[in-house]
Regions:
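Bacterial Sec-dependent N-terminal signal peptides
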Residues: 1-24
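Glycan-recognition and catalytic cores of secretory/periplasmic carbohydrate-active enzymes
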Residues: 20-406
Length: 406
């Protein structure tokens, strides 16, 4: 109990002053920091007995200083982010040692292309790892893993509902006959990619159907999102919306809205259908207008205890990355505003208030995984680091006059 109370004191102490954070952003210096932390993580993972490439960094809790690792299994949805961090770090540094480590960690996920789908997280698992690996190396074996995994993900699609079943494991325990979570929007990118890179063209149709049904059923009239949409498998109709990892079913869970912003940016990129661009801006505006001063959201926009509620750096990193891409699809005024907002978010994440610095080998502090389950509260979490370094690389490309998507 003393440990829990102490942790809460740390959380509340941070939150009370976090809104005063300010800073500037030197993108190369920020990427250098990420490179240093990545090397530090690899040294730590090696230890005395060498690296176990099946064990992936997942989190570092508030009072800890070393990665908690989890085995790369079909159930461990975050296992693709650490290989993805290594690929992004290699993209920046061109360090051959980092390339070798990225390849070894990525190889631990190949089995996912050969087994039935456990849930929708195959995109996070395989596209963050093998997707980035193929983008940077054009290894044909990587391409085949992605194509095979996309076909596996497609087996969860229900044509009556029109979406992918996100959590098969929750169908009976929660009486959620067909459930679709907002996180699932991110995994559509792998389907779009596969459809235009030698996979079944039907994968494109699945992604579009999923995006359309989610747009219709998983948002409130004010464009805030539900985390989970529960559907009837016979009629395909919506039964209810649930905010499983947020504060309440009526509130805007920060990372859920972040997934929506990122996901619909990808859908517009792949379809060029203006309805998605219009919708995307509405979803983005309701997020931006409710942010605190430093542009890093509370874990839920209606969380109890605001302004002392914990922030979620992971949501800020996801949105910053998405906005940098979205800014390139919009006229100068709106596009510039979104780009500037993304830079403000990254500047805050680049500050002492959010960076791990010498205290931990992660990039960022202060993310919230699952508050209602008392899990990963005010922690360093690997997906925050993944989207942070992705956003920095996107900003660097923009500053160099290159396409934001490489």
């Amino acid at each position: 109990m003393k440990k829990i109370v102490a942790g809460l004191v740390v959380v509340l102490g941070f939150c009370a002053c976090a809104h005063r954070t300010s800073g500037t952003l030197d993108v190369n210096k920020a990427l250098d920091y990420c490179a240093e932390q990545t090397q530090r993580s690899l040294v730590e993972l090696k230890g005395d007995s060498g690296i176990d490439y099946t064990m992936m960094p997942r989190n570092i809790m508030t009072d800890e200083h070393h990665w908690n690792c989890r085995k790369a299994t079909k159930e461990e949805w975050c296992a693709g982010f650490w290989p993805g961090v290594l690929w992004y770090d290699y993209e920046y540094t061109q360090d051959k040692h980092i390339l070798e480590e990225a390849e070894k960690f990525t190889a631990s996920l190949e089995f996912l292309s050969r087994i039935p789908a456990y849930d929708h997280d195959l995109g996070f698992l395989v596209f963050c790892s093998y997707g980035n690996g193929y983008r940077l190396t054009k290894n044909p074996a990587y391409k085949q893993v992605i194509l095979d995994t996309a076909d596996t993900l497609a087996t969860l699609f229900n044509p009556i509902v029109g979406t992918i079943l996100s959590w098969p494991r929750e169908v009976e325990p929660r009486n959620w006959p067909h459930n679709t979570i907002m996180d699932n929007m991110i995994n559509l990118e792998m389907l779009f990619w596969a459809a235009k890179n030698g996979g079944n063209p039907y994968l494109y149709d699945i992604a579009v159907s999923h995006a359309d049904k989610t747009m219709k059923c998983q948002f409130r009239p004010d464009y805030t999102s539900y985390h989970v949409a529960v559907y009837d498998t016979i009629t395909g109709n919506l039964i209810k919306g649930v905010t499983h990892q947020g504060y309440a079913d009526s509130t805007m869970w920060a990372r859920g809205q972040a997934w929506a912003i990122y996901g619909y940016t990808v859908v517009y990129r792949e379809t060029k259908d203006p309805k998605y661009l219009d919708f995307e801006q509405k979803v983005t505006e309701v997020y931006l207008e409710r942010l605190p001063e430093d542009k890093v959201p509370y874990w839920d926009f209606s969380a109890p205890g605001i302004p002392d509620a914990p922030r979620d750096a992971s949501a800020a990193a996801v949105v910053a990355s998405a906005l940098l891409e979205l800014s390139t699809y919009l006229p100068n005024g709106t596009g510039k505003r979104y780009k500037d907002a993304a830079i403000e978010m990254l500047a805050s994440l680049n500050s002492d208030s959010y960076q791990s610095g010498k205290s931990k080998p992660s990039f960022l502090l202060h993310s919230v995984g699952h508050w209602p389950a008392h899990s990963e509260i005010d922690a360093s979490i690997i997906y925050a680091d993944y989207y942070y370094i992705e956003a920095l690389l996107r900003l660097k490309r923009l500053q160099e006059g290159k396409n934001v998507i490489k």
